[in-house]
């Protein structure tokens, strides 16, 4: 008896291409989905679809092109731009995973008879929780922590126990269709940002307006090139008169286009409040480790959930925590929930 149908989110990259091969090799009926999330005119989609076409021919599978550009624009792109214009630091990949990949794409897969949706993410799931991947340098559990818990039972991550370098080596030997993919450059971290984030924001607002740099007492100590060019913890791109040691951005004030700077100790954070929780456990008070940005070291903390907010008390200080980023709660390698950072002190 043949195994169930799995749809694979295919990007034209090596991870999703090997994922499709692995699942077919295990006996699943495999079909692909390519997400068209924006209307780039630089050949981006054409290149990706060329790679997917070659892989689909090798595997003898069909694939769909799912145009979610409008939904992506409203729910991810606009949020990204608005965040920088309101002085917070966005995480578009987290939004995309919840709303687009494991929201709309999962709905599409189920409507087309798939029992599962697989992707080339480096993470693990048992249908109830996410866990860190074995390759900690590529682990993407942080970005998945806002996905609706009802979606987990449909999700598969075949690469969860592999190292990225092994997937690349494996793909290069598999077929010429895969070898071509391994020879192209890695895709950029945020698919719609071709160079730097400010190039995207500049399309929607004049962010190149000089403003005052303030010290922690509100005194003008220098100039900057426009608040949207800065994020919390940044130490370059502004002047501080008479400074003998590095100064860091500690606060952004969009209303009057000022930024506040201070020495490293001014970035110290001991408490965090988070909103828009996505919890995989029911406890309202617990100890765990928290990651306050991707690729950061996790920090031991106490968490209390009250009035739909997470009150996080860190057991050791963390420096440079930005509003708008995600606090992800871990128990060892298991993701037990997450919350968007609203305030710090």
From Swiss-Prot:
Q: Where is the active site?
A: 96 (nucleophile), 191 (cysteine persulfide intermediate)
SUPFAM superfamilies according to UniProt? Adenine nucleotide alpha hydrolases-like
- Where found in the cell? Cytoplasm
Entry's Gene Ontology BP terms? tRNA wobble position uridine thiolation
Gene Ontology MF terms: ATP binding; tRNA binding; tRNA-uridine 2-sulfurtransferase activity
Please state the Enzyme Commission number of this protein: 2.8.1.13
- The cysteines covalently paired via disulfide bonds are 96-191
Cellular component annotations (GO), alphabetically ordered: cytoplasm
Q: Is Electron transport there in the keyword field?
A: no
What is catalyzed by this enzyme?
Answer: S-sulfanyl-L-cysteinyl-[protein] + uridine(34) in tRNA + AH2 + ATP = 2-thiouridine(34) in tRNA + L-cysteinyl-[protein] + A + AMP + diphosphate + H(+)
Q: Which domain of life is it from?
A: Bacteria
From the UniProt entry, list the residue stretches annotated as the region Interaction with tRNA.
Answer: 138-140, 293-294
The site (Interaction with tRNA) lies at: 121, 325
Q: Which UniProt keywords apply?
A: ATP-binding, Cytoplasm, Disulfide bond, Nucleotide-binding, RNA-binding, Transferase, tRNA processing, tRNA-binding
Q: Where does ATP bind?
A: 9-16, 35, 120
Describe the task this protein carries out: Catalyzes the 2-thiolation of uridine at the wobble position (U34) of tRNA, leading to the formation of s(2)U34.
Q: Into which family does the record put it? A: Belongs to the MnmA/TRMU family.
Protein name in the entry: tRNA-specific 2-thiouridylase MnmA 1
**Species per Swiss-Prot/TrEMBL record:** Aliarcobacter butzleri (strain RM4018) (Arcobacter butzleri)
- Top-down, what is the taxonomic lineage of the species of origin? Bacteria, Pseudomonadati, Campylobacterota, Epsilonproteobacteria, Campylobacterales
């Amino acid at each position: 008896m043949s195994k169930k149908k799995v749809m694979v989110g295919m990007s034209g990259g090596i991870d999703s291409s090997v994922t499709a091969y692995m699942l077919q090799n295990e006996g699943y009926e495999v079909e692909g989905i390519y997400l068209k999330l924006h209307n780039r005119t630089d050949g981006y989609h054409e290149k990706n679809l060329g790679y997917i076409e070659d892989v689909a021919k090798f595997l003898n599978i069909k694939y769909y092109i799912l145009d979610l550009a409008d939904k992506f624009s409203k729910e991810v792109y606009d949020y990204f731009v608005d965040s920088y214009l309101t002085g917070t630091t966005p995480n578009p990949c987290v939004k995309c995973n919840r709303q687009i990949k494991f929201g709309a794409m999962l709905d599409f897969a189920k409507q087309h008879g798939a029992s599962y949706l697989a992707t080339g993410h480096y993470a693990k799931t048992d249908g109830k929780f996410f866990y860190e991947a074995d390759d900690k340098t590529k682990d993407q559990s942080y970005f998945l922590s806002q996905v609706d818990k009802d979606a987990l039972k449909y999700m598969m991550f075949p690469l969860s126990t592999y190292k990225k370098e092994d997937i690349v080596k494996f793909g290069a030997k598999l077929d010429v269709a895969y070898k071509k993919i391994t020879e192209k450059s890695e895709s950029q971290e945020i698919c719609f940002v071709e160079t730097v984030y400010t190039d995207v924001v500049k399309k929607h607002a004049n962010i190149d307006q000089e403003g005052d740099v303030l010290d922690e007492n509100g005194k003008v100590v220098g100039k900057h090139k426009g608040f949207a060019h800065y994020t919390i913890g940044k130490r370059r791109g502004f002047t501080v008169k008479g400074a003998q040691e590095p100064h860091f951005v500690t606060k952004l004030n969009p209303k009057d286009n000022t930024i506040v700077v201070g020495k490293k100790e001014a970035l110290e954070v001991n408490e965090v409040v988070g909103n828009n929780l996505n919890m995989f456990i029911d406890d309202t008070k617990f100890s765990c480790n928290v990651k306050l940005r991707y690729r950061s070291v996790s920090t031991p903390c106490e968490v209390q959930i009250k009035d739909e907010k997470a009150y996080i008390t860190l057991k050791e200080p963390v420096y440079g925590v930005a509003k708008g980023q995600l606090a992800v709660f871990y128990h060892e390698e298991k993701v037990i929930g997450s919350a968007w950072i609203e305030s710090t002190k």
